[in-house]
Regions:
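An active-site-proximal structural segment forming one wall of the substrate-binding cleft
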Residues: 100-116, 135-162
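Short, well-ordered coil/turn segments that N-cap beta-strands
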Residues: 33-38, 70-72, 116-120, 156-161
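C-terminal motif of bacterial Sec signal peptides marking the signal peptidase cleavage site
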Residues: 5-6
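The substrate-binding groove and active-site-proximal loops of carbohydrate-active enzymes
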Residues: 43-56, 88-101, 130-141, 164-175
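Boundary/entry segment of secreted carbohydrate-active catalytic domains
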Residues: 19-72, 77
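Active-site groove signature of glycoside hydrolases
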Residues: 125-131, 146-175
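Aromatic-lined substrate-binding rim segments of carbohydrate-active enzymes
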Residues: 56-68, 72-127, 176
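Ser/Thr-rich, Pro/Gly/Ala-heavy low-complexity intrinsically disordered linkers and tails
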Residues: 13-18
Length: 176
């Protein structure tokens, strides 16, 4: 990290040595004793994430790196968004206009979470329409079907610990 020091313009031209200051002069005593990061999100397929370029080798390296830095929990931020889904979920393929995914990322993520002894939480599907249109029950019903399907297909994984509710509400959300 670079620390900006107040130096005269003349001294600043010579760099830190001219100021007689270094980053160490400003470091806090507990710099390496912050609250550890133990969990992270996995962004599955959507929006602006170039996930399609990663295969199991890249994901394995990522999970290994996460484990090595102390992460013990991964959360699939959502099962899909709009037309993009993280696995071939039959309930979504039958009822929504979604693309058939080329890879079962959920199986891959759970297998890697098992391998590295991590807890895995599954995020819900975001249709990109029902929630925004105020059709909350439709989004909920869709996800209830998804939960049943996901548990039947993936519930045997030791790492599978539960669910993450990705839909958000605020004080501005009407008719909730």
């Amino acid at each position: 990290a670079v620390v900006l020091a107040a130096c005269s313009p003349k001294g600043a031209a010579g760099g830190d040595a001219a100021c007689g200051l270094s980053d160490d002069d400003f470091r806090t005593e507990g710099i390496l004793q912050a609250i550890p990061v133990r969990a992270t999100f996995l962004d599955e397929v959507s929006w602006d994430i170039p996930h399609q370029n990663w295969g199991v080798r890249e994901w394995d390296a990522d999970f290994r790196a996460m484990k090595n830095m102390g992460i013990n929990t991964v959360v699939l931020i959502r099962a899909g968004l709009g037309r993009w889904i993280a696995a071939p979920f039959e309930c979504l393929l039958e009822s929504e206009e979604v693309y058939y995914p080329p890879v079962d990322l959920v199986e891959m993520f759970l297998t890697l979470a098992d391998k590295y002894g991590m807890a895995f939480y599954f995020g819900m599907y975001d249709s990109g329409k029902y929630w925004q249109e105020g059709l909350f029950q439709r989004e909920i019903d869709l996800n209830l079907k998804l939960i049943d399907e996901v548990w039947a297909r993936y519930g045997h994984h030791e790492s599978f610990q539960g669910w993450y509710l990705s839909q958000e509400i605020s004080r501005r959300t009407k008719n909730m």
